Structures are given as structure tokens and as C-alpha cells.
């Protein structure tokens, strides 16, 4: 029997928000069942590959993570099924990178200025081994005098070995370039947006991440200055601001490529704040001249390096050319397989998309900014529309379907297409890791090529 109550129930079921209903015009299905691919490059093939590469199970494919390890295994399996030859190490498709984490080990780091001992944190932080600063992995300085060395990067000033040998050189500034982090690194005005449907949370979280990167020294450019090392300095101190983000980062391992042995064995380096610098010399650093001497310091700490449990690795395969006279010439196709992993906080998919559509149409190329009233109204309308269709979907996984899942699937599709066409020249397909961490995989391949680079056309 049909009743008004049953009709109302059916109507409610039909109009209630559903997570599987699309909101955006270009939104694809939430899931995609893998299907057999074909030599031609087709939308179905691209979806089949992309839905696997960017799946939540890959956990954002951060370099050295289990997710990226799984993604590289998938890529190698595709190469294997296509009949491509392994071109990695030891007869495999893989080229491992010595990627891992530097972490402080042993007793807590200590810096003694005169007779005052400071724990690492708000006033100073020891630096992990680094190519830009030339810093070593450990410090065991005992009552070593300090000498002011001027501004880091000012190579017009020559450091006299007679003054600096066996001493601790103190620079204003350090290897990180001020301002290089980008115009959208800190957007405090975004945090004051009204809390509407989570739109402000999406913006504030993005601003917080960028500000955290700025504070902890994660910046895309760095200066090199090896004058202190060349002058025989026993250690290096950089006078720079220190805040809570930078201090907290010292207590946790940070993933990085290990530096050369000669640099790991180089002089230890640390950042000190302006107050500590004043204690060293008895006056502000801005009033010092190169060669001014300060009090002696004692500094002890030790970093150790460990490779990731799931190795960071490139995936490399060769399609051998069909023409014997040209098979020794290679055409190289590459894309990076990694992304940025998992955020510390979850944001709502639809809120974030609404904010980015309105305020950042060019994606990361647009700075984080406060929406105009008109933009805020548009954002609110978009999110209200989304809420009428489905509930919020909070997520912390940065899936990387576009960056660079799209490039990865095109690499695989190109490999399948060319494998069916038997080109005259050989082709080498390189799936790099570590692009997001600073082009690490591509640099490692060019520094340690598995074929002669001059054979690449």
C-alpha cells in the first residue's frame, strides 16, 4: 500500500545528500574499475592508470614513503608487461637513491657561550649536514674562539686563514635565501575569514603550511658560500631569526639527500639568534667588522643518517630500437612519480575546490589571498551547492593526480604505444622520484646515468 509517509520517505531518499553524486561539471567518477589497456592512447587507458597511481592507498606518494614505493612497483610492472628491458641497477628496473633522514642522536645538543650553556631551541639550533652551508654531521668544539665573518654570501670579502683557521666563523644570514619562498608564503589576513562552510579552514591551512615551510627553512633557492671552510674554520654560526617552527623541526628527523662525504666531514654549523650573537661579541652583530673576535664557545651535537625503510627509487626501462644502425641512439621520455604525501590536517574537498576556483584559478602560481566580498559570496554559493548534493568529505591525502600522476600515466601510455610501433631508435623511459623534494631523482639519474648520456638524441 502506498501512503503519504512512504512517498515522503522515497522523496527524502532521492533528495538527500549523497557522497557519490557529482558536484562539479568536470568531476569524474569516484572509483574506476581497472580494465585492459590497448596500444592506442585512450581516455579509458588514462583513467585506468591514473585511478591506480593517485589512489588513496598510495598515500600521496611522498619520496621514500611506502606509497611511492608501491607506485614505483606498479610502474615497473607495467614496463615488464610491455616487454621493456630493465635499465636500472643490477638487472632491475630500479635505481635507488640514498634518501633518508638526518636525526639528532645521543646527548641533547648544547651550546656554551662563555659560561652560559644553552639548550637547542629558541636561541639556537644545530644544522643537519647540508651542501649549501658545507656543514658537517657532528660538533665537538671545546672552548673555541669566535670571529665575525661578515654577511654570508658576500664573496667580495676574503676571509684570511690566519684569522679564521681553527676558529668559529660567525655570519649574518645563512644559506637560505630571504624572500625566496614565494609571495604566498604567509598570508595572515586569510586566517581572519569568517568560518563559512569550512572555506576559511582551507585557506588558513594552506597559509599555515607555507608559513611553516618558511620558518623551518624549506625554501626553493639557496646560496653557497664556502669561504669559512676554505679558510679552515672549525665551525660556522649563522645569525638568523629563530621561531617555534624552526626550533621544533630540530627535534624531528627530516628527509634529505645525503651530502658528499667531504661535506659530512666538514665543519659543524648552527643558527643563533641576535641575542646570542650579542652575547658572543658584546654588541649587536650589525655593529661588527670582519675579523672582530668574541668569546669562546663549546658546542656538541651529532646527526646520524639512515636510509628510508622503503627506498626512494627511479624506475628506468628501455625499448630497444628496431634499426641496428640507430639502436644505440636514445630518445628519453620522463616524468616524476612522487607527490607531497599527507597533510597534518584534513580539509574538505569541496570547500578547498571552491576557494581555489575563485581565488586561485592558476593553482599554486596564484598567491593565497583574502577574497573580496564578491569572491566570498561566490565561494559560499559554490559550497552551499555542494552541501545540497553531498556531505563534507574531509581528507588529508594529497593524491597528486595532476602533479604528476597525469605525467606518469602519459609516460606509461607512450611506452605502450611505442612498444607496438617498433621505432628505429631506442627509447629510454625514466620515472623519477623526488621532484617535489628538489629534483632529486632526475639529478641522481644525470649524475649516475645507466646509459651514456651522450647517446641521448
Where are these regions (language model features)?
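Structural recognition of the beta-strand scaffold that forms the well-ordered cores
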Residues: 51-54, 96, 146-148, 168-172, ...
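N-terminal capping segment at the start of a domain
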Residues: 22-35, 40-66, 82, 86
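Extracytoplasmic/secreted proteins, especially bacterial periplasmic and envelope-associated proteins
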Residues: 41, 45-48, 52, 67-78, ...
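Short, solvent-exposed loop/turn and secondary-structure capping segments
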Residues: 64, 158-161, 180-188, 240, ...
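Noncatalytic luminal/extracellular "stalk/propeptide" segments of secretory-pathway proteins
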Residues: 24, 59-202, 295-307, 311-314, ...
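Acidic, glycine-rich active-site loops and adjacent beta-strand->loop/helix elements
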Residues: 175, 242-243, 337-339, 431-437
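A glycine-rich helix N-cap at a beta->alpha junction
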Residues: 448-457
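Soluble metallo-hydrolase cores and metallopeptidase-like ectodomains found primarily
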Residues: 30, 118, 124-161, 259-400, ...
Amino acid at each position: 500500500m502506498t501512503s503519504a509517509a512512504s512517498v515522503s520517505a522515497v522523496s527524502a531518499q532521492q533528495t538527500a545528500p549523497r557522497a557519490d553524486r557529482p558536484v562539479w561539471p568536470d568531476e569524474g567518477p569516484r572509483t574506476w574499475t581497472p580494465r585492459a589497456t590497448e596500444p592506442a592512447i585512450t581516455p579509458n587507458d588514462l583513467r585506468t592508470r591514473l585511478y591506480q597511481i593517485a589512489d588513496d592507498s598510495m598515500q600521496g606518494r611522498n619520496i621514500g614513503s611506502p606509497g611511492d614505493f608501491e607506485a614505483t612497483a606498479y610502474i615497473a610492472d607495467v614496463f615488464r608487461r610491455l616487454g621493456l628491458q630493465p635499465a636500472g641497477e643490477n638487472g632491475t628496473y630500479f635505481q635507488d637513491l640514498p634518501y633518508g633522514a638526518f636525526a639528532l642522536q645521543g646527548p641533547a645538543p648544547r651550546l656554551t657561550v662563555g659560561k652560559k650553556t644553552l639548550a637547542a631551541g629558541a636561541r639556537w639550533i644545530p644544522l643537519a649536514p647540508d651542501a649549501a652551508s658545507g656543514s658537517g654531521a657532528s660538533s665537538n668544539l671545546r672552548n673555541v674562539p669566535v670571529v665575525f665573518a661578515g654577511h654570508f654570501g658576500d664573496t667580495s670579502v676574503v676571509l684570511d686563514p690566519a684569522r679564521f683557521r681553527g676558529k668559529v666563523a660567525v655570519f649574518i644570514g645563512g644559506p637560505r635565501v630571504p624572500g625566496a619562498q614565494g609571495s604566498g608564503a604567509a598570508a595572515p589576513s586569510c586566517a581572519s575569514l569568517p568560518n563559512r562552510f569550512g572555506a576559511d579552514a582551507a585557506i588558513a591551512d594552506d597559509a599555515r603550511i607555507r608559513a611553516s615551510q618558511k620558518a623551518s627553512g624549506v625554501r626553493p633557492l639557496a646560496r653557497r658560500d664556502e669561504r669559512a671552510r676554505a679558510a679552515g674554520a672549525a665551525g660556522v654560526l649563522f645569525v638568523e631569526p629563530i621561531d617555534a617552527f624552526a626550533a621544533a623541526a630540530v627535534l624531528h628527523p627530516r628527509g634529505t639527500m645525503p651530502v658528499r662525504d667531504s661535506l659530512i666531514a666538514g665543519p659543524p654549523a648552527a643558527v643563533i639568534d641576535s641575542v646570542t650573537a650579542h652575547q658572543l661579541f658584546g654588541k649587536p652583530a650589525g655593529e661588527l667588522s670582519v675579523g672582530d673576535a668574541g668569546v669562546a664557545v663549546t658546542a656538541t651535537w651529532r646527526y646520524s643518517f639512515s636510509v628510508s625503510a622503503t627506498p626512494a627509487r627511479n624506475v628506468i626501462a628501455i625499448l630497444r630500437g628496431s634499426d641496428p644502425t640507430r639502436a644505440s641512439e636514445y630518445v628519453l621520455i620522463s616524468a616524476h612519480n612522487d607527490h607531497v604525501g599527507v597533510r597534518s590536517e584534513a580539509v574538505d574537498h569541496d570547500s578547498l575546490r571552491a576557494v581555489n576556483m575563485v581565488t586561485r584559478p592558476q593553482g599554486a602560481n596564484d598567491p593565497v589571498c583574502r577574497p573580496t566580498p564578491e569572491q566570498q559570496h561566490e565561494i559560499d554559493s559554490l559550497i552551499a551547492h555542494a552541501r545540497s548534493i553531498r556531505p563534507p568529505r574531509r581528507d588529508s591525502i594529497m593524491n597528486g593526480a595532476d602533479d604528476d600522476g597525469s605525467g606518469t600515466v602519459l609516460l606509461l601510455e607512450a611506452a605502450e604505444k611505442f612498444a607496438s610501433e617498433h621505432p628505429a631508435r631506442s627509447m629510454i623511459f625514466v620515472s623519477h622520484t623526488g621532484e617535489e623534494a628538489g629534483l632529486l631523482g632526475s639529478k641522481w639519474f644525470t649524475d649516475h646515468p645507466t646509459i651514456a648520456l651522450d647517446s641521448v638524441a
